[in-house]
Amino acid sequence: MAHYFKVDLDEEFERFMKELSDDSFENSNKTPRQPNEDNKEMKKKDPVPWWIAEDDFEDDGLLGTNVSYLKTKKTYQPVMDTEEESAEKVQFLKSSGTSILSVDSLEANELVVSEPHHSTLGLGLDTLEEQEEKEQFFARLEKGLTSSIDYSKLNQELDSDDSAQLKALHRYPRNTEPAEDGCENESEQEELPETYSDDFEDAEDADDPLITKDEETHPKENSESGKDSFPKQEEEKTGMLANVVLLDSFDSVEDVGLSSQEKATPKAKAPPEITDDGPAETGVPYGQSSGDTEALHQAYCHVAHSLGDTGEPRIEASTVQTVRSSIKDGLQENEESSKNVSTTESDLPTVEELMQPIRIDSYGIRAFDLQPISLKKATDSKEAESVGSLPLKTNTNTVSQDTRHAIQFPHKHDESVVLHRTADEGMGSSCPATEEHLDKMYLEILKKKTSVNPSLLPQDDKMNQTSRSQLGAGEEVPVIGKQVPCKKARSTPSLPKRKPQSGLYASARSSGYGKPSSPLQLFSALEKKTSKDNTKTKSVRSIPTSNQFRKREILSGTKLIKPAASNKPSPHREGSPATPKRPEDPSDDSFVQLQTEPLGSYGGNREKELLMLKRAQDAEEKWTGAQALMEQMKMTFCEKEKELENTVESLKRQQERELFRLNQENYILQAKLSSFEETSRKQRWLQFGETSDPLTGEKLKQIQKEIQEQETLLQGYQQENERLYNQVKDLQEQNKKNEERMFKENQNLFSELASLKEQMHKNHFLSQAVENTEPTKNQSFTDLLAELRAAQKEKNHLMEDIKRLKQDKQALEVDLEKVKRERDQAKDQIAYATGEKLYEIKILEETHKQEVSRLQKRLQWYAENQELLDRDAARLREANEETEKLRLEIEKLKTESGSPATQQRLRSKERALDAKRIQDLERQVKEMEGILKRRYPNSLPALILAASAAGDSVDRNTVEFMERRIKKLEADLEGKDEEAKKSLRTMEQQFQKMKIQYEQRLEEQEQLLAHRQKEAPQSQRNSSSRLKALETELGDIKEAHQITVRKLEAEIDVLKHQNADLEHKKNDKGDQGLQSIEFQVEQAQARAKLARLNEELAAKGREIQDLTKTVERLQKERRMMLSRQIPRSREETAAKRLKKDPNRGHGNAFPETLDGKLYHPHTFTDSHISEVLEENYRLRSELEGLILERSKLKMESEAAVCQLENSMKRVKDDAAAHIASLKASHEREIEKLLCQNAIENSSSKVAELNRKIATQEVLLKHFQGQVNELQGKQESLAVSQVREEILQKQITKLLEELKEAKENHTPEMKHFMGLERKIKQMEMRHRQREQELQQIIQQTRQVVETEQNKEVEKWKRLAQLKNRELDKFRTELDSILDVLRELHRQGVVVPMALAGEENTAEF
C-alpha cells in the first residue's frame, strides 16, 4: 500500500507539473537533480534541521511578504472505481494512522459528477487571491500608482534571512488545522448529505468539528494502527521528499521537509487530519528569485539526508507523507465541491472560504490550533472558539532546555533535535493534568464571552491576557495523541461569490511578482481575502508575543476574523511539541534579539491598525444594533403570532359553545315535538273514540291547548330562527374584522421589514461611502464585504422568518377556513333542523285540516241524519199519540159497550162474596162476643181484630191506587226524560248544522271581501287617475279661460283708456282722432300678439331646453351602450371567425406595436344594418318612454299648479269672508253704540220702540247670517264627516293590515292567525250555545222540580191524612180500652181462648 501511495503521489506530482503553465515555471529544468540529494541528506543526518523548532509552532502571523504554500496532491478517481478505491484507502489510512476524506461535506451528491473533471485547486492554493492582487497591482502600475516601489529593495527583503525564518512559522499549524477541518466536513458529508443548517446563530458562533465515520467508529484503532504502519513506510516516504520540487512556482520542497519534520515528532500516534478549508500551505515567499529557491532546495535536501540517517526521522517523514496524502485528498475534494457550491445561494462554503484559513494562518492565527481535546464532548463551538485563542504552543523544553530555545528562532540543528526528543519524552506525563486545566479554561472563557457582547478587539485582548497568564504560570499544554472523534457540525454558511478567474490555470498560485513590498499593502491585500469570514466568527486568535513586531502583527490580525472551521478544537498528535513557559514581559531579551528588523519595517502601521480596529468596533456596533432590531422584530412576530393563535382559539371556543347551545335547543325542541306528537295522537284517538258522543267542553279545551302549544312552538321556532340569523351575522362581522386585523398586521410587518431593509441598505451605503474616503481602500472594501455578508445573513434570516410567518399565516387561514366550514355546517344543520320542523309543522297542519274537514263532514252528515231522525221521531210521536187516543177510545167503548153484563156479573160476584164475608164475619163476631163475654166481658182483642179487618181493606185499595199512580208518573217522567234528551240532541244537531252553515257563509264572505279588496285599489287607482286627469284638464281649461279673461280685460282697459283719450281729443282732432284710434287699436292688438308670441316663444324655448337635455342624456346612454356592446359584438364576431377559421387566429399573433396597443381589425369596421336598426328601435322606444315620462311630469306639475291655485283661491275666499265678518261685526258694534246713544239721549216711547225694533231687526239679521253660516257649515260638516268616516275606516283598515303584516311575517303565520280568529269566534259561539243550553236545562229542571214539588206535596197530604186516620184510630182504641178497663173494674172477665184465637187470626 505504501508503495502504491508513493507511486500515486509521484504520478500526481508529474501531472501537476505538466498542467502548470504559469510564468513562474520558466526555470523548472533545475528540478531533476534534487531528489537523490534529498534522499542522501535525509539518510546522513540524524538531528533535526535548524529550520524546524518550536517557533514554527509559535507562528504569530509574521508571514509578510514571504508566505509559502505547498501544492496538493491531485487524485484521479474514475467514476466507476470510487467505491473500491475508497475502501482500499480506508484500509490503508487506518493502518497508517491518517484520516480518510471520503466525500467533502461541502459537496453532497455531486461527487460522481465532479470527479471526472479533476480539481484545479491542486494547481495552486491561494492563486485566486494572488491573481486578483496581481491584476490590481498591474492596474495600479498602469495608472502610475506604484512608481515608488523599489524592486531591488523588495528582492533583497525577499532573499533575506527573515523570509526563511518567517515562512517556517506557519507550516505545522497550517498542515494540522486544515486537516482537522477537513475531517469535520467529511463526517458531515457522510452523515448529512444534501443538508445544511438553518441555525445561523450557531453557525455564527462556531461550526462544530466534523469527522469521518471511520474516525468515529475507530478512533483508537487509527492511533494504534498508525504506530504499526509508520516504520514500514519510512524509506519510501523519505524517497518521495526528494521528488517534490517547485522552483519558480515557489511551492518548494522546503515545506515538505518542514512539514515532515514538524509532523514527525509524534511517535507514530498522530490522528487522522484532513483539511476542510484548503490545501496545506508551504513557506514559499511571495517574491523569491530562482537563486533563492535553489538555496532553499539545497537546504531541504540537506534536511532530508539528516533525517534519513536515523530511524525516528524516517518515521517522521512517513507521517509527513501520510498527512500530505490525506491533505491532498481533502483539498481535491474541497475544490470539487467548490465548483458546485459557488454558484448557489446555499450555506456551503465557497472556494474563497476554503482558501481563507491559509491567509489567516499566514498572519499567525494558526499558532493556537494545536489544542488538547477535552474528554467531554459537550464543549460547544464557543468553547472551541475561546480555546482556539489560547497560545497552545508546543513545549519543546519541558525537561532540560532553556525557555530561550523555545522562544527564539533556532539556527542550530542539534538544539532543535534535542528539543524535539525532550518534548517527546516529556509528553506522556503532562497530558491528563493539562487537559483538566484546559477544560476549566474553556468554561471561564465561555462565561466571559456570554457576559460581554462579541466584539473583535476586546475578545482578542482577553484571550491574550488569559493565554499569557496561563502559559506564564508554566503550565504545559498537552498535545499527546488522543484520538478524539470530531464533532458533527453544521456546515458553514455560504459567503458571497468571488470574481471568477478565467484561464486554464486560474486556480494555480503564481510566483507573487508584483506584490506590494510594504507590509501595509500586504496586510490590506490579505485582509481583503480573509475578511470574507468576518460575520461567521466572533473572536480572533491573537498570539501573545514578546516583541513589538508581534504585537503589531496581532493588532493587524484582529481585523481578520477566523473562518468557520478554525474555531474547533483540533485533534492533536502524540508527541507534538508542547508550548514553552512564556514570560509575561513582552520585552524579553530573547524576543528583542530576534525581532529587531521587523520592528523597523512595521513601525509606521500602528495608526492605520488603530483606525482599522475602530472601524471594526463601529461595524460590530452596527451589527449588534441590527441584531437588536432583528430580535425586536422576532419578539413582535412572536407576539402577533400568539395573538392570532389566541383569536383563533377564542373563535373556536365560541363556535363550540354555540354548537353546544344549538344542540341543546334542538334537543329541547325535539322533546317538545315528541310531546306534541303524543298529545296529537291522544287527541286523535279521543276524537276517533268519541265521534258518536256530543262535542263537550273537554274536547274544546283539548283543541285549545293543542292550538296554544302549536302557537308557542311556532313562536319559539320564529325566535330561534331570528336569533340564529343574528348570530350568523355577528360571526360574519367578527370574521371580517379578524381578517381585516390580520391583513393590517401583515401590512405593518411588511412595512417594518421594508424599513429595516432600507436602514440596512443606508447603513451599508454610508459605511461604504465613509470607507471610500479613507486611504486604505482595500481594508474598507473588506469591511464592506463583511457588513454586506452580515446584512445578507440578516436578510436570509428575515426571509426565513417571512417564510415561516407566511406558513403560519397559511395555517391560520386554513384554520379560519375550517372554522368557516364548521360555521357553514352548523348553519346548514340549523337550516335543515328548522326546515324539518317547519315541514313537520306543515304536515301536522295539513293533517289537522284534514281531520277538521273530516269532522265537519261528519257533523254535516249527523246534522242531515238528525233531520231525518227528527222527522221520524215526530212521526213516531204522532203515531203513539194516535194509538193512545185510539186505545183510550177503545177502552171507553169497551166500558160503554160491555157494561150491563159485566156489571151484573161483577155485582153478583161481589154480592156473593159480600154475603159470604158478612156471614163469616157475623159468625166470627158472634163467636168472639160469646168468648169475650165468657172470659173477658170487656176485652180489647175482639175490638182490635174488628178494627184491623176494616182498616186492611181500606189500606189495600189506597196502596194499589197509589202504586198505580206512581208507576204512571214514573212512566210519564221517563217519557219526558227521553223527550228532553231527544230535544237536546236535536238542538245540538241543529247547532252543528247552523255552525257549519255559518262557517261556510263566513268563508264565502271572506273570499268576497278579499276579492273586493283586491279590486278596490285597482278601481281606486283607476278612479284616482281619472280624477287626476280630469282635474288637470279642468285646471288647464281654467288657466286658459283665466288667461283669455285677463287678456280681454287688459284689452278692455286699454280700449277704455283709448276711448277716454279719444273723447277728450274728439273736439280737437276729428278725422285724425279716428285714425289715431285705429292706429292705437292696431298697436294694442300688435302688443297683445307680441306678448302672446313672447310667451309662446318662452314656452318653446323651455321645451327645446328640455328636449336638448333629454337628447344629450340619450346620446350619453347610447354611447355607453355602444361602448359596452361593441366589444361584445367584436368578441362574438372574432369568436365566430376563429371558429370558422382557427388557423387565422394563430397566424395573427404578431408582436405588439411600439405604443403597446394591440391591433384590432374590427375596431373601425361598420356594424351590421340589423344591429343599427335594433339600436334605432331601442332608442325610439326609449325616446317614447322619455316623452311619456315628460308628459307625466307635465301633468303632475299642472296638477300641482292647480292645487296651488285652488289653495290660493281658498285663502282669498277665507280672507274675504274674514274681512266681511269683521265688517259685519264692526257695523253691529256701531249700531249697538248708536242704539245705546239713542236710548240714553231719547226719552219718548216711540223712540224707544223704534230702537227696540231696530235692535230686533239687527238681531234678526245677525241670526239670519248665523243661520246661513251654520247651514253652510253644516253642509261642509256633513261632507267632512263623511270624509272623516271614510278616512277613519281606511286608517283602521290600514292599521289592521299593518298589524297583520307585523304579526304575520309568513303565510303560515297568517293562516294560523286566521285559524285563531275562527277559533275565537267558535269559542264565542260555543259559549253562547252553552248559555242557551244551560238556560234550557235550567228551565227543564225548574219544570221537573215543580212537578216533583207537586208530587211531594201530594204525598205529604196523603201522609197527613193517614196520620189523621191513625190519630182517630188511636182515640177509638183509647175509648175501647177505657170501656175494657171499666168492664174489668166491674168484674167482667174476658176469656183467654178468645184472645188466643184472636192472636192466630192476627197471624
From Swiss-Prot:
Main location: cytoplasm
Modification sites for Phosphoserine: 160, 163
Coiled coil: 614-1124, 1174-1386
Cell compartments where the protein resides: Cytoplasm, Cytoskeleton, Microtubule organizing center, Centrosome, Centriole; Cytoplasm, Cytoskeleton, Spindle; Nucleus
Region (Disordered): 20-46, 169-243, 256-292, 306-348, 453-606, 1126-1147
Keywords: Cilium biogenesis/degradation, Coiled coil, Cytoplasm, Cytoskeleton, Microtubule, Nucleus, Phosphoprotein
Family to which the UniProt record says this protein belongs: Belongs to the CEP162 family.
Compositionally biased tracts (Basic residues): 485-500
Reported function: Required to promote assembly of the transition zone in primary cilia. Acts by specifically recognizing and binding the axonemal microtubule. Localizes to the distal ends of centrioles before ciliogenesis and directly binds to axonemal microtubule, thereby promoting and restricting transition zone formation specifically at the cilia base. Required to mediate CEP290 association with microtubules.
Source species: Mus musculus
Residue spans of biased composition, Acidic residues class: 178-208
Biased composition (Basic and acidic residues): 35-46, 210-238, 526-536, 571-585, 1128-1144
Keyword Nucleotide-binding belongs to the record: no
Transmembrane segments: none
Protein name (database record): Centrosomal protein of 162 kDa
Subunit structure: Interacts with CPNE4. Interacts with alpha-tubulin. Interacts with CEP290.
Any one GO BP annotation for this protein: cilium assembly
GO CC terms in record: axonemal microtubule; centriolar satellite; centriole; ciliary basal body; cytosol; Golgi apparatus; nucleoplasm; spindle
InterPro entries in the cross-refs: CEP162-like
